[in-house]
């Protein structure tokens, strides 16, 4: 049987910022069940690589394929990719329920009950209707991460998702990411945190070395 092609594939990828080459000739791919951790020192291009894989930036050279299609600057509505950046990216005046309802509408709408269950999963039961600007940094991070507990894309691209989490939140997120991969999902992640649970499809790439 011919193996399925990678869901996400980057070929001969290069990135340049402020006239400086961050990386070049970079190849990577993800199939169902894979987790790819991107590492490297500050300034090596970790966030830039993730933004390239999301179509939020264009590479200096090379291309990114998502489900066999070249990923351009404008992703198609509802494409099978979920991006969570370093900042929670919440609307301060909206509640967690309202923020998540708006975010889910980009992929697969979710009702109040489903959103309530997602907030409960990240330890925010009872905070559904509190304006997000009143929440702590850790609570805002958990609101954003609640998106991972709602129906949606199978590919998650996450930039430093453990930021501002306590030890319980870190352990819960580690398990959720591993479970997602073991159920056929995919994760690309940057983190300074040492992961204690790795799925079978775990790999890492060090941008300082340019190797996977």
Curated annotation (Swiss-Prot):
Q: Which InterPro entries match?
A: AAA+_ATPase, ABC_transporter-like_ATP-bd, ABC_transptr_haem_export_CcmA, P-loop_NTPase
Major location, coarse class? membrane
Annotated membrane topology:
Peripheral membrane protein
Q: Does the keyword Translocase apply?
A: yes
Per the UniProt record, which EC number(s) apply here?
A: 7.6.2.5
Q: Which residues cross the membrane?
A: none
GO MF, one term, reads: ABC-type heme transporter activity
Q: Which GO terms describe its biological process?
A: cytochrome complex assembly
Q: Name one GO cellular component term.
A: plasma membrane
Q: Ranges for the ABC transporter domain? A: 8-212
Provide the binding site for ATP: 40-47
Q: Where in the cell is it found?
A: Cell inner membrane
Pfam families reported for this sequence: ABC_tran
Q: What class of enzyme is it?
A: translocase
Q: Which reaction does it catalyse?
A: heme b(in) + ATP + H2O = heme b(out) + ADP + phosphate + H(+)
What family does this chain come from, according to its entry?
Answer: Belongs to the ABC transporter superfamily. CcmA exporter (TC 3.A.1.107) family.
Subunit info here reads:
The complex is composed of two ATP-binding proteins (CcmA) and two transmembrane proteins (CcmB).
Record protein name field: Cytochrome c biogenesis ATP-binding export protein CcmA
Organism whose genome encodes this protein: Pseudomonas syringae pv. tomato (strain ATCC BAA-871 / DC3000)
């Amino acid at each position: 049987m011919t193996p399925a092609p990678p869901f996400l594939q980057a070929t001969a990828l290069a990135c340049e910022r402020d006239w400086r080459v961050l990386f070049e000739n970079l190849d990577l791919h993800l199939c169902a069940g894979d987790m790819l951790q991107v590492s490297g020192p500050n300034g090596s291009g970790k966030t830039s690589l993730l933004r390239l894989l999301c179509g939020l930036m264009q590479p200096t050279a090379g291309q990114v394929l998502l489900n066999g299609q070249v990923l351009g600057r404008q992703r198609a509505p509802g494409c099978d990719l979920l991006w969570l950046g370093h900042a929670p990216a919440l609307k301060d005046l909206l509640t967690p329920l309202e923020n998540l309802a708006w975010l889910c509408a980009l992929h697969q709408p979710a009702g109040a009950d489903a959103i309530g269950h997602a907030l409960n999963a990240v330890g925010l039961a009872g905070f559904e209707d509190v304006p997000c600007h009143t929440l702590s940094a850790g609570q805002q991070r958990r609101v954003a991460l609640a998106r991972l507990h709602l129906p949606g894309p199978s590919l998650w691209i996450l930039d430093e998702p453990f930021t501002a989490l306590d030890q319980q939140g870190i352990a819960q997120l580690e398990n959720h990411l591993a479970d997602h991969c073991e159920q056929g999902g995919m994760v690309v992640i940057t983190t300074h945190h040492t992961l204690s649970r790795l799925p079978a499809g775990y790999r890492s790439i060090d941008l300082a070395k340019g190797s996977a």
